[in-house]
């Protein structure tokens, strides 16, 4: 079985058979071509780094920050780190791998010479196999092994020479030794026989002497054993008795110890309690002594000392008694126990008597209530108090009378001054009102002018900016146009010439039968990204892995073979994924091969579809594709399973593996483990290509490759149902028949079978075989092309059993093969633009359009604002008289308090320490009797020892001929390499954190080269740099002397080649090890939240290569960083709070309210940072771009604290009216961070960046800045929203906070004139006539406070300065809720509810001033989530003729707001005619001037009264009003 693997054209893969063996595709050349293509296509573009420029703007409040895909709101350098280049990925995947080695040569001349001589002496010489000393890595290990080998060669030579000499000497010595030994053997044997005869005679004599003393010894021994038994029994009895006595002693001793311990414990506790009690009594005595008279104290002290001496004497007697009893206890235990009992009884009786006595003393103390001396003092003080009280009362009465007289005079003068000032004020306010009205009109007109001017300026600046950009682009395009046009014309001319030449050869093999240029360049996209949408099911990567694992042989050999994948393993419920998951030879399968692209990395997403279901794939990040020279940005494919497919999977499922590279296409399979007859599988492909502007590309005869269409005896691969026109390649087996593209006339599998001219696979004996390979010269044999037009195209591709297309009669017969045999229902195909015909020219140049110069916009003419009129000068008012000062009353003397008398207490005597029992005497052990002495057995004379037969020395045999062996060694070395990563201060930063824009240096170090190495002819180091790393090539060259440095921008790789001088130094003495020098890469890291991983490759003499270790460093802003657990997004945060610390973001804020902005300086992600001093000196700043048009700074309230609540030191704050007003250093700092404040702003600056870094940054300590700002009063008059944003700037990198928006409600109080106090009656008689003596109301409608406001109301009042010459306040007013109110406890007060009881009024009728104020506790009880608005009705009576104007002031939380002005007129009343009984008479009552009003809770619908209590005229008010109404 074979899965075909190709990268170009429409590639179709299915089951193949070839004589029972696997069909192997030619892949070596293709792999090399792919590698070259990948190297050219995968360059990581570099971005120029300039602090003065950036890619985003934050000058407008609504401008979004670019680059937020990093998760960090960066204002400069916001881009996300690109994917690593394929070179970097491959290099790091092979980290520490080595290829080849450096051989080491050690001289063998000494050993060679030594091996020649031994044979002359008869010694055998043999050479062993060469010993491999291995391949070592460290050079010092090689330096160690070389002397070892050299020493061993010398040792082998010496051993050979020594073995030869030794053999010669051994042969001569052997014969002399043999003669000597034979002589010694004969002498020893004769002496032994003589000694043996003498010994035998002496043994007989000794036996006769030993038979006499034995019986006596045996009798003594028997008596000894009898005595021993008796003594042992006696000793055993004695020991038993001692043991019993010892046991009784141990028990008694333990009992006595316990009893004594208990007695001692009880004594010590009693003593401690007594001491504590006495200490308490002493303290009480000392306190009493301090409060009592000295004489009484001294008397009691003398008594105490007397009693104390007595107690101490008693205690001494007790101690003596205790000592006596203790001595008696130690003499006799039984008597002591009896005495102890008697002593205890006596002690307890004494203790009881003592307690009774103390109780009696306590009772006597309580009976004593006073002290005679203290009582006398108290009575004297009381008499003096009564005398002083009478004098004070008399003086205060006279003082009050004097004050009342002065007060009357003051009030009279005050009334006169106030009346005069009121008249002057009224005239002034009318003038101010007129001026303000005029200025309001001018201000509104000027505001409109400013808006029109600003809009005109903004439009102009936008047009001018766009014009300048277009002009720059125009100039650039104009400069480039001639070259582009010439290049395009040259290419078109070359294509035209090529097509003319091809027309001559169009009927020759391999040429397009209809010559055409290829306008579609679409061959390879390894970096493409794919997104999927499907009505089928997405599959998990783990499900694919499990399914491939059932192909055990290939899977165990790390080969992924889709052709063998069984679809049934993908049909489990838990195989379904919720999102796209990629699978392939990457990740944990890096290094595996696939039948799609051998060892190159392949990724694919998987879906499970049924007939008629689709998957739509969108391919982006295309790098290499063009149409007519114009970049292709996106391709969209819709893959649909053809409903007419005849595969036989019972579930109807088809697996689609959709490759991330769109030119690799799709693998489709319904294979369930069995070959199927009469089967087929087809996939419809609908596709659209898009240009760089996102517009569909309208193809005009673009060519799409149809390649590798195989036909065997039982299987046909084909294309059908396509939107284009088929173009045949001359000589190809592929044609078009019945709307299908396939090998129509012959098979094309094997030469000679079914008319095939070539074999699809390579055969060494067949020229032209192997056509089914992308790089085969005759790959056109199985290919064709389709010419496509229009934006939307389609083609269906698949594989089918031959029986579905042709009858058996139409099929060629191949001997030994069955045309109806089953096949796998699967296919791999791809669509791309690589046409297999020969010499097809490609269109690579886009036809340039002549640039058109843009038109410069005209600057607008701005309108001029009008000047405001001057306000009138406020008159000078008479100062009011100073109120009389009342002399303060004399203070009433304090009445003395009668004392409480105390008496001292006596000390309690200490308890007597008890006596203790004497411990028992331990028993004495009886000593054991001594055992009898055992009799001594008599000694016997030993028998003489017989002589020992001598050992005869063995005669040596002949000397054996030695074999001397020797061997040679071979040794190789693989010098190691090390990559190090340093900051600008040369500190190691591997697996650590440094700031964005930091300089990062990579040092490429190589170990010493060993002695005995071959000559070094080349020494090259290649470093594929990480994406987002900005190489400084010039600095790199300076830091790398001894190397030539070059940079390939396409692959983002820097290469170091040793100079001739460096090579000469390495080769100066090959017999000695040599140290290497190393180059250094210098550059900057440019991305937030990025990890920069890197290694390099060393290649020596093109024979030894090694890849280094991997180093990595991370920039802040990356969550879940395994190297830096504290790393996280850089998110400065801003929140608005009220004075109680409640967050008020988004809430309505009243004018005059202080916003407590809380700014978070987010530093926790920098914990453990290893940035260099150079970038630390760029500083640390926090910028608050506050709305100065709405807020006033409260710099006196600014606070900075750290995460632990401690005050932050070393940070200065400054505020600037605008960017232009800031110092140049601040402007430069903001410019580099790409931050443009809209107006005024604050800057918090770390005074000493290094100290700030050490204290807060490297420790990851977040800081909190509280910067209060008060809403300007004017905002309440106009209303409107204001917004606030902040920025933190760390290491020169800016990050934007969230935007905080609040709204200031417009407080717009209104005033009406009404005839009723009914809130439901909205009739307003403003501007109308009020009859003389008519009662009416001023309706004061307070400003509305919207719901969800930021802070509690604490002030809400109505101040009405009415014209008292025409209006008279009746003393009545009402307050009503204008909107529904919700209190904090949940109570709801409906609109229209009487709120008068929650108010209080102050009335000044003389000056026509009434102030109605809501009580603060009521206002604070209203929930901030509730709206608030109230209205007040002031009842008035018209008392004069004329026109009267009235305005009131609504005060809300300290800010005043003026209402509109109402005007009413009263004409002269008509003169009454003679009195007629039917005529109504008007009665006028003049109320007396009242006092300030304090309302009581409302009762029913009664009006509150503010006048004198004798307002008897009130019942007639209705009559008066009615009469007045008809009097004119």
UniProtKB/Swiss-Prot annotation:
Please give, as recorded in its UniProt entry, the membrane topology of this protein. Answer: Peptidoglycan-anchor
One Pfam short name? Antigen_C
Q: What segments bear the compositional bias annotation Basic and acidic residues? A: 142-154, 855-879
Q: Where is this motif: LPXTG sorting signal?
A: 1503-1507
* Start-end of Low complexity biased regions: 51-68
Query: What organism is listed for this UniProt entry?
Result: Streptococcus downei
Gene of this entry: spaA
**What's the source species' lineage?**
Bacteria, Bacillati, Bacillota, Bacilli, Lactobacillales
Query: Gene3D superfamilies recorded for this chain?
Result: 2.60.40.740, 6.10.250.2200, Major cell-surface adhesin PAc
| Ag I/II A repeats mapped onto the chain | 161-235, 236-315, 316-396, 397-478
The pro-peptide lies at: 1507-1528
Q: Where is this region: Disordered?
A: 50-156, 840-951, 1459-1480
Q: Does the keyword DNA-binding apply?
A: no
Spell out the subcellular localization from the entry.
Answer: Secreted, Cell wall
Q: What is this protein called?
A: Cell surface antigen I/II
């Amino acid at each position: 079985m074979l899965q075909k693997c190709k990268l170009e054209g429409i590639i179709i893969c299915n089951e193949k058979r070839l004589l029972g063996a696997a069909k192997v595709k030619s892949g070596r050349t293709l792999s090399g071509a792919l590698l070259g293509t990948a190297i050219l296509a995968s360059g990581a573009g570099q971005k120029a780094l300039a602090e003065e420029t950036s890619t985003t703007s934050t000058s407008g409040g609504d401008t979004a920050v670019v680059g937020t895909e990093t998760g960090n709101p960066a204002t400069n350098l916001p881009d996300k780190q690109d994917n690593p280049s394929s070179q970097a990925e491959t290099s790091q995947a092979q980290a520490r791998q080595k290829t080849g080695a450096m051989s080491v040569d050690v001289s063998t001349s000494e050993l060679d010479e030594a091996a020649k001589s031994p044979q002359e002496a008869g010694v055998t010489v043999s050479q062993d196999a060469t010993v491999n000393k291995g391949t070592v890595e460290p050079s010092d290990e090689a330096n160690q092994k070389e002397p070892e080998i050299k020493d061993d060669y010398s040792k082998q030579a010496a051993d050979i020479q020594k073995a030869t000499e030794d053999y010669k000497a051994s042969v001569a010595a052997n014969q002399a030794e043999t003669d000597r030994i034979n002589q010694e053997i004969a002498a020893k044997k004769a002496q032994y026989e003589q000694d043996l005869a003498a010994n035998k005679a002496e043994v007989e004599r000794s036996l006769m002497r030993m038979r006499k003393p034995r019986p006596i010894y045996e009798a003594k021994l028997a008596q000894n054993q009898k005595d021993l038994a008796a003594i042992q029994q006696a000793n055993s009895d004695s020991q038993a008795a001692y043991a019993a006595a010892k046991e009784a002693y141990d028990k008694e001793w333990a009992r006595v110890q316990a009893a004594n311990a208990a007695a001692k414990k009880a004594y010590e506790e009693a003593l401690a309690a007594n001491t504590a009690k006495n200490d308490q009594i002493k303290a009480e005595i000392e306190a009493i002594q301090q409060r009592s008279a000295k004489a009484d104290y001294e008397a009691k002290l003398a008594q105490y000392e007397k009693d104390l001496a007595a107690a101490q004497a008693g205690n001494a007697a007790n101690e003596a008694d205790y000592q006596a009893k203790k001595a008696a206890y130690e003499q006799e235990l039984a008597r002591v126990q009896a005495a102890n009992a008697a002593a205890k009884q006596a002690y307890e009786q004494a203790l009881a008597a003592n307690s009774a006595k103390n109780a009696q003393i306590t009772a006597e103390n309580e009976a004593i209530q006073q002290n005679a001396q203290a009582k006398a003092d108290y009575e004297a003080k009381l008499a003096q108090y009564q005398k002083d009280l009478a004098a004070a009362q008399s003086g205060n009465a006279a003082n009050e009378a004097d004050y009342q007289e002065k007060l009357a005079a003051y009030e009279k003068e005050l009334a006169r001054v106030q009346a005069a000032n009121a008249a002057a004020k009224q005239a002034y306010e009318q003038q101010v009102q007129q001026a303000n009205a005029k200025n309001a009109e001018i201000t509104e007109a000027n505001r409109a002018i400013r808006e029109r001017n600003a809009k005109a300026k903004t439009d102009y600046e936008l047009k001018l900016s766009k014009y300048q950009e277009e002009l720059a682009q125009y100039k650039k395009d104009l400069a480039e146009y001639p070259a582009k046009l010439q290049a395009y014309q040259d290419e078109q001319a070359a294509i035209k010439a090529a097509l003319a030449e091809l027309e001559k050869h169009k009927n020759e093999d391999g040429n397009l039968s209809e010559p055409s240029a290829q306008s579609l360049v679409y061959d390879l996209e390894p970096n493409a990204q794919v997104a999927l949408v499907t009505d089928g099911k997405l599959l998990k990567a783990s499900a694919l892995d499990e399914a491939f694992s059932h192909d055990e042989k290939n899977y165990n050999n790390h080969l992924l073979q889709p052709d063998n994948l069984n679809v049934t393993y993908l049909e489990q419920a838990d195989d379904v994924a919720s999102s796209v998951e990629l699978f392939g030879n990457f990740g944990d399968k890096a290094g595996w091969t696939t039948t799609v692209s051998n060892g190159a990395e392949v990724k694919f997403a998987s879906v499970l579809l049924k007939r008629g279901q689709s998957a739509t794939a969108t391919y982006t990040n295309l790098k290499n594709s063009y149409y007519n020279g114009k970049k292709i940005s996106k391709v969209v494919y819709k893959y649909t399973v053809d409903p007419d497919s005849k595969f036989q999977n019972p579930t109807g499922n088809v697996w689609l593996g959709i490759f991330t590279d769109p030119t690799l296409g799709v693998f489709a399979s319904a294979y369930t483990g069995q070959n199927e007859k009469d089967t087929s599988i087809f996939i419809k492909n609908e596709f659209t290509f898009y240009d760089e502007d996102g517009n569909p590309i309208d193809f005009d005869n673009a060519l799409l490759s149809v390649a590798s269409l195989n036909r065997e005896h039982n299987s046909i691969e084909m294309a059908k149902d396509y939107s284009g026109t088929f173009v045949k390649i001359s000589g190809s087996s592929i044609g078009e028949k019945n709307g299908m593209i396939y090998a129509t006339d012959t098979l094309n599998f094997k030469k000679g079978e079914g008319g095939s001219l070539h074999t699809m696979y390579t055969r060494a004996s067949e020229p032209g075989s192997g056509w089914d390979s992308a790089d085969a010269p005759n790959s056109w044999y199985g290919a064709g092309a389709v010419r496509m037009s229009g934006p939307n195209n389609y083609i269906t591709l698949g594989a089918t059993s031959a029986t579905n297309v042709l009858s058996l009669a139409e099929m060629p017969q191949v001997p030994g093969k069955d045309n109806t045999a089953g096949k796998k229902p699967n296919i791999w195909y791809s669509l791309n633009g690589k046409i297999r015909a020969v010499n097809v020219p490609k269109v690579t140049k886009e036809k340039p359009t002549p640039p058109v110069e843009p038109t410069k916009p005209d600057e607008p003419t701005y309108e001029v604002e009008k000047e405001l009129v001057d306000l009138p000068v406020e008159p000078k008012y008479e100062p009011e008289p100073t109120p009389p000062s009342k002399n303060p009353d004399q203070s009433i003397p304090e009445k003395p308090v009668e004392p409480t008398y105390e008496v001292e207490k006596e000390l309690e005597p200490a308890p007597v320490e008890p006596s203790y029992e004497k411990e028992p005497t331990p028993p004495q052990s009886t000593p054991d009797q001594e055992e009898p002495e055992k009799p001594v057995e008599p000694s016997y004379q030993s028998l003489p020892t017989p002589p020992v037969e001598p050992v005869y020395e063995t005669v040596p045999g002949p000397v054996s001929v030695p074999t001397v062996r020797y061997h040679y060694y071979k040794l190789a070395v693989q010098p190691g390499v090390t990559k190090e990563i340093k900051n600008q201060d040369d500190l190691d930063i591997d697996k650590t954190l440094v700031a964005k824009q930091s300089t990062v240096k990579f040092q490429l170090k190589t170990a010493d080269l060993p002695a005995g190495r071959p000559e070094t002819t080349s020494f090259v180091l290649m470093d594929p740099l990480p994406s987002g790393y900005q190489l400084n090539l010039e600095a790199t060259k300076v830091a790398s002397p001894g190397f030539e440095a070059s940079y390939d921008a396409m692959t983002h790789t820097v290469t170091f080649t040793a100079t001739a001088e460096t090579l000469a130094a390495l080769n100066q003495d090959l017999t000695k090890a040599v140290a290497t020098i190393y180059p250094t890469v210098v550059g900057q890291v440019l991305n937030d939240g990025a990890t920069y991983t890197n290694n390099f490759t060393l290649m020596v003499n093109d024979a030894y290569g090694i890849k280094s270790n991997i180093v990595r460093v991370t920039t802040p802003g990356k969550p879940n960083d395994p190297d830096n657990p504290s790393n996280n997004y850089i998110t400065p945060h801003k929140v608005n709070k009220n004075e109680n610390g409640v967050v008020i973001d988004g809430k309505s804020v009243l004018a005059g309210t202080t916003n407590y902005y809380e700014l978070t300086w987010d530093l926790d992600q920098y914990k453990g940072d290893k940035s260099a001093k150079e970038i630390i000196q760029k500083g640390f700043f926090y910028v608050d771009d506050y709305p100065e048009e709405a807020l006033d700074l409260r710099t006196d309230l600014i606070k900075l604290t750290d995460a632990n609540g401690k005050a932050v030191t070393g940070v200065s704050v400054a505020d600037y009216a605008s960017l232009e007003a800031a110092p140049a250093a601040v402007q430069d700092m903001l410019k580099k961070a790409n931050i443009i404040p809209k107006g005024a702003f604050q800057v918090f600056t770390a005074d000493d960046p290094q100290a700030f870094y050490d204290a807060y940054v490297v420790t990851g300590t977040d800081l909190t800045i509280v910067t209060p700002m008060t809403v300007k009063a004017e905002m309440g008059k106009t209303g409107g929203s204001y917004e606030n944003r902040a920025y933190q700037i760390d290491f020169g990198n800016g990050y934007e906070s969230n935007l905080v928006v609040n709204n200031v409600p417009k407080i717009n109080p209104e005033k009406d004139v009404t005839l009723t106090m009914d809130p439901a009656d909205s009739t307003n008689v403003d501007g109308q006539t009020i009859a003389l003596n008519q009662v009416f109301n001023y309706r004061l409608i307070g400003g509305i406070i919207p719901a969800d406001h930021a802070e509690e109301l604490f002030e809400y009042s109505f101040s009405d300065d009415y014209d008292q010459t025409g209006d008279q306040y009746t003393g009545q007013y009402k307050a009503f809720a204008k909107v529904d109110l919700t209190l904090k406890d949940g109570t709801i007060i409906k609109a229209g509810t009487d709120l008068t009881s929650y108010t209080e009024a102050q009335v000044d009728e003389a000056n026509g001033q009434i102030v109605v104020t809501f009580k603060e506790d009521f206002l604070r009880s209203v929930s901030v989530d509730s709206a608030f608005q109230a209205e007040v009705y002031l009842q008035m009576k018209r008392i004069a003729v004329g026109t009267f104007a009235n305005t009131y002031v609504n005060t809300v939380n300290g800010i005043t707001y003026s209402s509109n002005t109402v005007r009413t007129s009263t004409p002269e009343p008509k003169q009454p005619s003679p009195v007629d009984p039917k005529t109504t008479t008007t009665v006028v009552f003049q109320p007396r001037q009242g006092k300030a009003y304090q309302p009581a809770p409302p009762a029913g619908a009664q009006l509150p009264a503010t006048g004198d209590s004798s307002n008897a005229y009130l019942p007639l008010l209705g009559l008066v009003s009615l009469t007045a109404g008809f009097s004119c």
